[in-house]
């Protein structure tokens, strides 16, 4: 006689990479998914960007490059969802770098004494 073992449900409610449901299925688990409309997709990408940036912020050593690659992947998807090419986004970044500078000088602003 076989005993019934109920599945444990774990909620994620987040955007995942395209192959994640397949990978979950290969473990014998069942992923319940849906395809987002454009507005929900953009919102989910913005949430994913925050998630990946937080993971990158907490990463150390050899983990950091992989986390930065995740941030890059989300940025590319977000640019595409906004109707921009990666080249257009890089051009915007270059323009801003020209106007405001980069982060190469390692300048950390502690405070400003404002003239009244």
Label each residue range with its predicted role.
Residues 2-116:
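Flexible "arm" and connector segments at domain edges
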